[in-house]
Swiss-Prot record:
It comes from the Bacteria. PANTHER family: UPF0102 PROTEIN YRAN. Disulfide bonds: none annotated. This is UPF0102 protein BAD_0596. Coiled coil: none annotated. GO terms for molecular function: nucleic acid binding. Pfam families: UPF0102 (PF02021). CDD domains: PoNe_Nuclease (cd20736). Belongs to the UPF0102 family.
Amino acid sequence: MNHSSSHDVPAPTQPPEQILDSLARRLHDGTLRSRQIGELGEQYAAAWLESQGWRTLDRNWHCRYGELDVVSRNPMGQIVFVEVKTRRTMRYGTPQEAVTASKQINLRHAAVQWLTAPEHRMPNSGVRFDVVTVVVQGDRPLLHHIEGAF
């Protein structure tokens, strides 16, 4: 089984506020393609979670069931699998509407794969699935954190 993360998760070298400000400016670049917007949205969501006391354990982890955008440990010790959806407009519905029932099933399967990998075995106080939406409008991205989304 091929499990991979496309990003290492280094410790931040800047205060979270500076990271969020920098990412917010980059998200408002009108020349970005949708894939780039999505990647920056994931970075923005992870930085925001870290600013709330969360610890990023993994990002963009792949297995046969798909990709886990962000895997974090929240301050209560739960392992939280965070699906991030970033949009410029609501033309095609809200970002959270893109997390369909079939997507949720695949995310659950991917989470089991992540949890059972020997390198990820760790004590925890439970597992949860959250959705973070990032809407790039106005002067600052609008982030919405849906805890226990499914």
